[in-house]
Amino acid sequence: LLHCAEAQKTYSDLLLKQIPENAKSILDVGSGSGNTAKKLIDRGNIVECISPSSFLSEEIEKKLGSMVTIYKTLFEKLETDNTYDLILFSESFQYVPIKKSLEKCYKLLNSNGYILICDFFQKDPSHFTELRGGHSFPRFQNVIQSLKFKEISNIDVTEQTAPTIQILDDFLTQFGGPLKSLTNFYLENRYPMFSKLLKWKYRKRIKKLNRIYFSGQLTAQEFMEQKTYRFMLYQKQ
C-alpha cells in the first residue's frame, strides 16, 4: 500500500507538471473523487468536473463544495456554453469515444487551448490479452493527426507504471487468493445450496475473474508488452 501511495504521488506530480502556466480554466473529465481537482484549485486553477457517477459526484461536493462546478453526465453528452484553456483526461480517455470526444474538445477549447491525456492504450488491439481496456494507440494517433491539434509533448511512462501492475498482482496472489478461498469455504459450509446456485449462475464470470486476476498473468512484463502508458499534451490550432 505504501508503494501504491508513492506511485500515486509521482503520477500526480508528473500530471501537474504537464499543465502549461497559461492554462487557467480546466475541465476535468472523469474526476474520480476530486483529488486532482483539489490540487488544481489549490494552485489557482478554475476547475469544472465531469462525473457521471452519483456517488463520486457527492464525494467531490463534500471535498470541494462551491469551489467547483460538477456536471453529472458523460463527456460526450455535456451541454455547456463555457470554454476552457485545458481539458484533462486523467485515466478517463479510455472510456470515451476517440473521434467524437476529440472533436468535442476542439469546440470546448479556447483559442490555443490544450488537451492533456494521461492514460494507457493498446499497442496492438488485434493481439488477444487478458489485460483489457484502453483504446488502440495507432487508431488514436491517426484520428488526432487528422484534426487541428499540435503535439506539444508525448511522454512514455509505461516502464515506470508497470511495477504498479506487479504490486497489484502480488497483492491479489498473497491476499486476494486466500480471501477468496476463505469466502468460498464459509459459503459452502453455511449456505451450501445458495453457494452452488451462485457458482452455477455466475460460472462464466467467475472463471473469467479467476483467469484474469488469480492466474499470475497480470504481470508488469505483460503490461509492458501489450500496453503503452502516455502523458500527451496537444494544443488547438
Please identify what each model-predicted range represents.
Residues 99-114:
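A short glycine-rich, Lys/Arg-flanked "PGG" loop and its adjoining helix->strand segment in the class I
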Residues 77-87:
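A short acidic, Gly/Pro-enriched loop at the edge of an enzyme's catalytic core
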Residues 5-22:
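Conserved alpha-helix/loop element of class I SAM-dependent methyltransferases that forms part
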Residues 170-180, 224-237:
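Core SAM-dependent methyltransferase catalytic element
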Residues 27-77:
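Class I SAM-dependent methyltransferase SAM/SAH-binding core
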Residues 128-218:
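Substrate-binding/catalytic lobe of Class I Rossmann-like enzymes that use SAM or dcSAM, i.e.
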Residues 86-98:
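A short SAM/SAH-binding and catalytic strip from SAM-dependent methyltransferases
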